[in-house]
UniProtKB/Swiss-Prot annotation:
ATP binds at G34, G35, N36, G37, A38, G39, K40, S41. Plays a central role in chromosome condensation, segregation and cell cycle progression. Functions as a homodimer, which is essential for chromosome partition. Involved in negative DNA supercoiling in vivo, and by this means organize and compact chromosomes. May achieve or facilitate chromosome segregation by condensation DNA from both sides of a centrally located replisome during cell division. Belongs to the SMC family. MukB subfamily. The keyword Transmembrane helix does not apply. The hinge domain, which separates the large intramolecular coiled coil regions, allows the homodimerization, forming a V-shaped homodimer. Residues 326-418, 444-472, 509-602, 835-923, 977-1116, 1209-1265 form a coiled coil. This is Chromosome partition protein MukB. Pfam families: MukB (PF04310), MukB_hinge (PF16330), SbcC_Walker_B (PF13558). InterPro entries: MukB, MukB/SMC, MukB_hinge, MukB_hinge_sf, MukB_N_dom, P-loop_NTPase. The lineage of its organism: Bacteria, Pseudomonadati, Pseudomonadota, Gammaproteobacteria, Enterobacterales.
């Protein structure tokens, strides 16, 4: 018998009152006795903490917290510890005699939350001699020890050999180890399991009936039937998967046409685009090559045109240069002609103005003389008028003074003053300081004589001035003429220079007369020179065009050679057109033949594709139509044979399925009716009783019972006799055996065992001999073995049936394919390959194109040579008439010589024209230049001085005359005399005044008349001078203009200039005509070059674009080809017949397929997205990706194990066949998987019966338990009424609710929930789903109601409630229930842990003083019978008779608390034995 594990001891380290204390635990009851606060609860708390180190659960209440909603913040643990490291350890020994120490390290965490840190650990392999306190403490001296930390403990244990130390980071791992080693009774996998365990310990600790446990006794006592639930879940999952698969199969079958449509349209969509890109790539390559050929041709043409353009541009540049010089010459000639005409007009004007100037010069000289005489006379008249005016003024002054003196007394004084003033003025003017009035008359005569002398001298000088002025005028005129001709010079050199000028003028006139003959001669030579230069230019141009220099003598021979070449080239050019026409005709014939073959090629390719498909499908090669028809007959025969074999395999497969279904019945009943009869009779099938028989014993028992192996074992046959009457729904032979199903054996028969057989003595006169069956089916193991072999056979048959079905369908499809081929393609399939002929004709066409290009090139060169020869002949025709000019080498020198002479003559003509008139005027007056009349200036000065002397003498005489006249004023004798004297004087003065005024009037009249005449003369002179100056200035301007013109205006100059201009105009017109021709030709050439350049740029751009497109397309095409080859779809996409369709047709085909595909994949998000991406024309590989995605989608939908061909249509047809097979197989599988509602009810009922029996066995162990008035305790298990109704309906009335269980939309759990709602509409299901409710209904525990009952006194059996029991009775009843829970846990966990381990059993009971002695004895008896350990706490007045008792006393010594512990074993009269681990000094001397 397996020995149960036990707790050996509890060790507390550094707890409040316990520094290092180990409590040895009794094998039955350990009592902690002591007063209040002695440490009993602390000790139990340490035990519970080591057992369940979960701070979320631990809560050590005390009686002061009764009714409180929450305890202290630390839940009672923080205050039970001391500062520092604390330990609580349990020393255990399990059924395997392994010592295991488990415990926790505790430590207070600083802070107001009063938290505690817990670390669980375990120690294995510790020797029995080592005490727990020795592990975690270190002795410092006799009275001091130190607690080791967890790390130090680990290091210490690592040093001990064979000892294993484990520290746990999770409570789950800690409890898992304790469960595996048999320390706790149940595996605590989750926090919920730990909570149940803690509530059980808590209920045990505080005693009484725990409502938390009694309310959920099902969770504590009834094991979870996880196997059944998992079986149901697996069944539902399998059914769900089966139904989903069936639904997918139905959808796939309904989508077959869609798949075909999808494959067809996807193939058209992608293959059309694939072939269009392939065609475009080939077309682009051809276009790129054509562009390159055309590019090279255009470059050659452009180079030729550029050479031609350079030649023409050079010639045009020469003509432009010549035209520029000709235009300059022509413009110069025109300007020269204009200048000559202008010079002639200027010369006429100059001559006219010179004649006018000579006439004006004469008139001006005459008018000068008249004006000079008038001016002299005017001066005299002015002098006389002035003198007369002065005299009148003097006389009037004297007469006024005199009148004034007469009027005033001071007259004489005034007169005297006036006389004195006159005397002073006379002294001043006459320079006579000694002048007196008396001597004034004498001096007057002297000065009047001097005045007369000065006047005479002045008249003499005036005559001399007139003569000198005439001589001076002639010299100046002659000098000015010389200076005008020669320039500035000294007056002394005038005579010599004038004679030299006159001699030079004669020479210049002689040279000027030679201008016209020289000009004519020069014009003639220049014309010949220009013709010579033109001939040289033509020769140079000709040589340049010919690329060779020619002598003059070679030109005539060259002319004849070129004419001969022209004749030969003309014949070659005319014959080239006929050859070109023949080549073009052959090219057109080839093109027509190629077009015809291209139209026939798609039909032939379609026939070849069909023929190749047939060859691949049947593995035969066909070379004629007769072979095709013969093979078709073979197919028909093969199809008939395959159909026969398929039907045979199908019949055998159905038989195997029926046998498997029969053997798969629950309980081994081959007939479903047997289960119903067994339930009806209250019996058990014999096969169910022997369901656990081994495979080795199955043949024996099968032979033993023979036909009665399907019998029903009933407790009493007499009780079912009445039920047999009228029984019809049963097998033909129904065997009934009387016996106890719980203890049935094979002793009902007398049997003799033979070799592989038995003899059963049914009666004295009836024996049965049965051999051991080769394939026994009695017992679950035998049936499973047989079913396994049948399944293997069925798999082989299914595979063979599927293969044969495939073969039949394949043969049928092959027959249809041959029929279609014969009807559509047989007539063209075996004709010659048109593509090979097309390739041969294309090669010939390329040769013809190359020949045409060569011919065109040769013809073009011949035409170019022909044109060059014609141009050479034309140039020679212009050049040959001028050969004599080319030979004249002295022409240029003669032109230069004549030009020099002409320049000299023109210079002389200009000199004569400019200075001829001056020389003509100088010649008659040149003699006056011999003497220079320079004294004329001196004479003018003398004349001016004499004129001033004569004026001064006149003033002096007048002043003296005034003094003489005023001599009387110097002395007056008296006033009378003065008045008479004044009267005379006044009369004289008046007479003189009258004479003076008359003289003044005459002088004024003469002055006025002479002034008017002088003014008239002056005006005439001014007019003449102005006219002279104007004409002189105009003449000078005309002469300057003539000089600026720089031409000599003679009679022949205009004619020569006009002739030169006309010649240059003709040359310019010819040059312009040629230039225009060259410009037109150059413009045409430039246009041609521009067209060629534009064409070349376009060709280069097109070529580069095309090449780039080709390169890009090549990279993309390589990616496409790589993708196509990697995915193996090249054969499907490369449809050669599409190569003969145009790009528009292929694009239209692709677009139509795209429209159909958009509708087809509208409901598939993945394909819709891939299709949308594939519409990008720049990314052709995405269409391949779409095609691959379609096939991948079809593979996923069709199942890859079905697709046995690369052809998608065949794959779908094979899929259809396989789907029909799968549908049949899955339908039968669903029938096998689907458990009936009756079976479910039976399983749940049997499980309930089993658990009721188990509870009944547990009740037997509690019948003898009694506490106070409680005589017995039991558990009452009942089936809920609503659930019992559900089980009845499931068993008997399932046909009424088949709408739920046969629905494919509902799982079995959901159908069960719907049925429960239908039967109990009054129950509110809340927010729970039918699936959740159904899963709960599949758990048998939800069908049961459990309650604890007690047999108390006279009340009988009552429901155990705290209110109906005393405290002690409640504690005992609760402890009984807990013992039952622990035992139930052990039974449930026995299958989880090793069978050689019996776990520890330990419960707590705090405050056991509420129990009386009889109740405590009952606890002792219960612990002994159940091998359970119990720790109870009681005050000092309670002492049990058995077990181990610890007396705890808390003492205080020097502010330090410690608990004094004394351990006693039993209550015997002898001295108690001191227990290990206690202090001897604490043991009392006697028991009390």
């Amino acid at each position: 018998m397996i020995e149960r594990g036990k707790f050996r001891s509890l060790t507390l380290i550094n707890w409040n009152g316990f520094f290092a204390r180990t409590f040895d635990l009794d094998e039955l009851v350990t009592t902690l006795s002591g007063g209040n606060g002695a440490g009993k609860s602390t000790t139990m708390a340490a035990f519970v903490t080591a057992l369940i180190p979960d701070l979320t659960l631990l809560h050590f209440r005390n009686t002061t917290e009764a009714g409180a909603t929450s305890g202290s913040r630390d839940k009672g643990l923080h205050g039970k510890l001391k500062a520092g490291v604390c330990y609580s350890m349990l020393d255990t020994i399990n059924s395997r005699h392994q010592r295991v120490v488990v415990g926790v390290r505790l430590q207070q965490v600083a802070g107001r939350d009063r938290k505690v840190d817990i670390k669980p650990f375990a120690i294995q392999g510790l020797p029995m001699s080592v005490q727990p306190t020795q592990l975690v403490t270190e002795t410092l001296n006799e009275r001091q020890a130190r607690v080791l930390s967890l790390a130090e403990l680990k290091d210490k244990l690592d040093e001990m050999e064979g000892v294993q130390f484990k520290q746990f980071n999770s409570i789950t791992d800690y409890h898992s180890l304790m469960f595996d080693l048999g320390i706790i009774a149940r595996r605590l996998r989750s926090a919920s399991d730990r909570s149940k365990f803690y509530r059980l310990i808590e209920a045990s600790l505080y005693g009484g009936i725990s409502s938390a446990i009694t309310r959920s006794l099902r969770d504590y006592l009834l094991p979870e039937n996880s196997g059944v639930r998992k079986a149901f879940q697996d069944m539902e999952a399998a059914l769900r998967e089966n139904r989903l698969t069936l639904e997918a199969i139905r959808v796939t079958q309904s989508d077959r046409d869609l798949f075909k449509h999808l494959i067809s349209e996807a193939t058209d969509y992608v293959a059309a685009d694939y072939m269009r890109h392939a065609n475009e790539r080939r077309v682009h390559l051809d276009q790129a090559l054509a562009f390159r050929r055309e590019l090279y041709t255009s470059r050659k043409q452009l180079a030729a045109e550029q050479y031609k353009h350079v030649d023409m541009a050079r010639e045009l540049g020469e003509h432009n240069g010549a035209e520029g010089s000709l235009e300059a010459d022509y413009q110069a000639a025109s300007d020269h002609l204009n200048l000559v005409q202008t010079a002639l007009r200027q010369q006429e004007k100059i001559e006219r103005y010179e004649a006018d100037l000579e006439e004006l010069q004469i008139r001006l000289e005459e008018q000068n003389e008249v004006v000079a005489e008038a001016a002299e006379m005017q001066d005299e008249n002015e002098a006389r008028a002035e003198a007369a005016e002065l005299e009148v003024d003097e006389l009037k002054s004297q007469l006024a003074d005199y009148q004034q003196a007469l009027d005033v007394q001071q007259t004489r004084a005034i007169q005297y003053n006036q006389a004195i003033s006159a005397l002073a003025r006379a002294k001043e003017l006459c320079h006579l300081p000694d002048l007196t009035p008396e001597s004034a008359a004498e001096w007057l005569d002297t000065f009047q004589a001097k005045e007369q002398e000065a006047t005479e001298k002045l008249l003499s000088l005036e005559q001399k001035m007139s003569v000198a002025q005439t001589a001076h005028s002639q010299f100046e005129q002659a000098y000015q003429l010389v200076a005008a001709i020669n320039g500035p010079l000294a007056r002394s050199e005038a005579w010599d220079v004038a004679r030299e000028l006159l001699r030079d003028g004669v020479n210049q006139r002689h040279l000027a007369e030679q201008v016209q003959p020289l000009r004519m001669r020069l014009s003639e030579l220049e014309q010949r020179l220009r013709e010579q230069q033109e001939a040289e230019r033509l020769l140079a141009e000709f040589c340049k065009r010919q690329g060779k220099n020619f002598d003059i003598d070679e030109l005539e021979a060259l002319h004849q050679e070129l004419e001969a070449r022209i004749a030969s080239l003309s014949d070659s050019v005319s014959s080239a057109s006929e050859q070109r026409m023949a080549l073009r005709q052959e090219q057109e014939q080839l093109q027509s033949r190629i077009q015809h073959l291209m139209q026939r090629a798609p039909v032939w390719l379609a026939a070849q594709n069909s023929l190749n498909q047939l060859s691949e499908q049947c593995g035969e090669e066909f070379t004629s139509s007769q072979e095709v028809t013969e093979y078709l007959q073979q197919l028909l025969e093969r199809e008939r044979e395959a159909i026969v074999e398929r039907d045979e395999v199908g019949a055998r497969k159905n038989a195997v399925d029926e046998e498997i279904e029969r053997l798969s019945q629950p309980g081994g009943a081959e007939d479903q009716r047997l289960n119903a009869l067994a339930e009806r009779f209250g019996g058990v099938l014999l096969s169910e009783i022997y369901d656990d028989v081994s495979l080795e014993d199955a043949p024996y028992f099968s032979a033993l019972y023979g036909p009665s192996r399907h019998a029903i074992v009933v407790p009493d046959l007499s009780q079912i006799a009445e039920q047999l009457e009228g029984l019809t729904d049963c097998p033909e032979d129904l065997y009934l055996i009387e016996g106890d199903p719980q203890s049935f054996d094979d002793s009902v028969f007398s049997v003799d065992e033979l070799e592989k057989a038995v003899v059963v003595k049914i009666a004295d006169r009836q024996w049965r001999y049965s051999r051991f069956p080769s394939l026994p089916i009695f017992g679950r193991a035998a049936r499973e073995n047989r079913i396994e072999s049948l399944h293997a056979e069925r798999e082989v048959l299914s595979e063979r049936f599927a293969t044969l079905s495939f073969d039949v369908q394949k043969t049928q499809r092959l027959h249809q394919a041959f029929s279609r081929f014969i009807g559509s393609h047989l007539s063209v399939a075996f004709e010659d390959d048109p593509e090979a002929e097309i390739r041969r004709l294309n090669g010939r066409r390329v040769e013809l194109e190359r020949a045409l290009a060569t011919h065109e090139n040769d013809n073009q060169q011949q035409r170019l040579q022909f044109e060059q020869a014609k141009e050479g002949v034309s140039a020679l025709n212009r050049l040959l008439p001028r050969l004599n000019l080319l030979a004249d080498e002295t022409l240029a020198d003669r032109v230069d010589e004549i030009q020099e002479r002409l320049d000299e003559a023109q210079e002389a003509a200009r000199f004569v024209q400019q200075y001829g008139n001056q020389l003509a005027k100088l010649e008659p007056v040149v003699s006056v230049l011999q003497s220079d009349p320079e004294q004329f200036e001196q004479l003018k000065e003398d004349y001016a001085w004499s004129q001033q002397m004569q004026r001064d003498a006149r003033q002096q005489a007048f002043a003296l005359a005034e003094v003489v006249e005023r001599r009387a004023h110097f002395s007056y004798s008296d006033s009378a005399e003065m008045l008479s004297g004044n009267s005379d004087l006044n009369e004289k003065l008046r007479q003189r005044l009258e004479q003076a005024e008359a003289e003044r009037t005459r002088a004024r009249e003469a002055l006025r008349s002479h002034a008017a005449q002088l003014s008239q003369y002056s005006q005439v002179l001014a007019s003449l001078k102005s006219s002279y100056d104007t004409k002189k200035e105009l003449l000078n301007d005309l002469q300057r203009e003539l000089q600026d013109i720089g031409v000599r205006a003679d009679s022949g100059a205009e004619e020569r200039a006009r002739q030169r201009r006309d010649e240059l105009h003709a040359q310019l017109s010819n040059n312009r005509s040629r230039r225009n021709q060259l410009e037109k030709a150059l413009t045409f050439c430039e246009a041609e070059m521009e067209n060629l350049t534009r064409k070349l740029r376009k060709l280069e751009r097109d070529y580069h674009e095309m090449r780039e497109q080709v390169v890009t397309a090549k990279a993309g095409w390589c990616a496409v080809m790589r993708m196509v080859k990697d995915n193996g779809v090249e054969r499907r996409l490369h449809r050669r017949e599409l190569a003969y369709l145009s790009a528009d047709e292929l694009r239209s085909m692709s677009d139509k397929a795209l429209g159909a595909l958009r509708l087809a994949v509208a409901d598939n998000e993945h394909l819709r997205d891939v299709l949308r991406l594939s519409e990008d024309p720049k990314r052709p590989e995405r269409k391949i990706q779409f095609f691959v995605a379609v096939y991948q989608h079809l593979r996923e939908r069709i199942r890859q194990d079905i697709i046995r061909t690369d052809d998608p249509v065949e794959a779908i047809e094979q899929m259809e066949i396989e789907l029909s097979r799968l549908t049949e197989e899955l339908t039968s599988r669903e029938q096998k998987l689907a458990i009936s509602s009756r079976s479910v009810a039976n399983i749940i009922r049997k499980t309930i019966q089993r658990e009721q029996n188990r509870i009944r066995m547990l009740n037997q162990g509690l019948q003898s338990v009694s506490f106070g008035q409680v005589n017995s305790v039991r558990l009452n298990v009942n089936v809920r009424e609503t659930h019992a109704t559900l089980l009845d309906v499931l068993s008997e009335q399932q046909e009424q609710h088949q709408d739920l269980f046969n629905s494919n939309r509902l799982t079995f759990s959901e159908a069960l929930a719907k049925l429960y709602q239908r039967l109990n509409p009054q129950i509110d299901m809340g927010q729970r789903t039918p699936q959740t409710i159904g899963e709960e209904l599949l758990d048998y525990r939800n069908y049961l109601e459990m309650e604890v009952e007690v047999n108390r006194g006279s009340d009988g059996w009552l429901r155990a409630e705290s209110g109906a029991l005393s405290t002690g009775e409640a504690i005992g009843t609760g402890m009984s229930i807990l013992v039952m829970v622990v035992q139930s846990w052990e039974d449930e966990a026995r299958r989880l842990r090793g069978k050689d381990i019996s776990p520890c059993r330990l419960l707590f009971l705090d405050e056991a003083a509420r129990l009386d002695a009889r109740s405590i004895a009952t606890l002792f008896e219960l612990c002994e019978r159940l091998q359970m350990q119990l720790i109870i706490a009681a005050p000092e007045n309670i002492s049990p008779e058995k077990g181990t008792t610890y007396k705890l006393v808390r003492k205080v010594f020097q502010n330090t608390e410690h608990v004094h512990v004394v351990g006693l074993r039993g209550f015997a009269p002898q001295l108690p034995e001191t227990l290990p681990g206690t202090q001897t000094e604490d043991t009392p001397s006697e028991a009390s």
